[in-house]
Amino acid sequence: MKFKSILPFAFLVLGVNACTDEDEGVGASVQPVGDLLSAFSNRIDVSSSSVFVDSVLYKADFLYLGQYTDTYLGTTQCEFLSQFDARIGGISVPDTSLFSYTNKLGISKDWLTKIDPDYGNIKAVTNPNKVQVDSAFFLIRFDDEVLGDTNALQAINVYALTANLPTFAKHYTNVNPDDYCDKGRLLGSLAYQTANRKMKKYASNGDNEIPRILEVPISLDFAKEVVNAYKKNSSIKNQRQFNEKFPGIYVAHSFNEGAIVKINTCFLRIYYHFQGKIHTTYKGKDTIVDSKSLGRANPLVKSLSIACDKSVERVNVFKHPNNSSLKTLAQSSEFTYATSPASLYTQVVVDFNSIRDSIVRKVGPDSSKLSVNSALLKLKAASINWDTKLKKTPNQYMMLINRDSIADFFYWNKTPDGLYSFNAGLDTSDFSFSFDLSRAVQKRLKGAKNSEKLLENLVVIPVYITSSGERRYYHQQLWPTASRFYKSSADEVKLRPCIDLVYTRRE
């Protein structure tokens, strides 16, 4: 076999530059004109600072509750407001459905056999009447991710809202609860220690999930009003009408500080019983039992549960009562900080003129044949070195984003586009975050439309990522965290924030 052609080839030689502009592209004497691809690199220093932020958009899978004081971050207090997911049309009171197992949430089919083995299973319940509320609780389930002193005694109050949260609105964490609640109707209170909350199995499908739970006793008068909304003759026919009658609840931190918890679910549960005709068998023959005749053994006991979930309007309220500690951190001459929730951002100033000038000095003003291969903004992180219950290493993911676009980014579930938003994970090999700015730098060098807005007003914020199938979702971090980065004043050059720029020019 003969090869009748010779494949041409080209050499790509990278000229590596640290902080100077003296290096030139190499390889011109090797390749013919028109085939040459010269490479260059620059290091561009950037400046950074900490800026205080008093609120962020609330759009999260979780709610947060409690109060914790850190030596340097000061006090963080978490409360929340929420509507109820009424499920109008999906719930009726009294509920006569039957369950095949003994459960305080339903009517057990085999209840009568426990009274008299000659009875058979309950087949149906008819003529339900005389509903009576027995008790009501606002239940708050949280996982093991707790921050603070779990043995400290703290308390919460649950109030009825007097005004509705705006529908389909952007809710921010500095919302004033007084705009929606005059605190004139206290529904319930609870003093608790996080460590002592009993563990309860609540999964009936064998998964054995065991969350911690807070049970706040709720006013029976309020519970009766809610139950009436689900009766057959109720005038409430949809969620909007329900919200007009019951705008929601405000869960407020009452006293003392201890721990902050991450809430998985929370809901109002009302227990009630009623009377009715129980259709069953006795010694194999059909019979009807009047529940009144059973007295305290009446099996017609049910519950009504309505959740404060993501399908309704809700918002966390974050307060930093003594933010002087945060402001002191923001003035640090050694580090910048990105903390959560709603406290400090690291602001990064990218001087695009410095980027352009460094390129012009090497290749001239013509950028038509220029390609930006890499423009990595590197931030070197440092562990927290003070006594704290916070995680001392940086948040796993950071986002560099135009500050004015933060709310829209998270509200519309956007993903980093490499123009106005950039994501980076912690590189544990050198404890740094690297944000790829190459696309934005390229567009601005080429003078693309509106490119003058790129790389402006940038801040670094902590985020976390979830996924569903192949889709990734980015969420602003609302759990208390603290990350810090070296400033340009760091003694070691390698610790200073900078952009490592690599670009090529076709001759």
Which residues does each PLM region occupy?
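Secreted, disulfide-rich extracellular signaling modules
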Residues: K2-F9, V13-E507
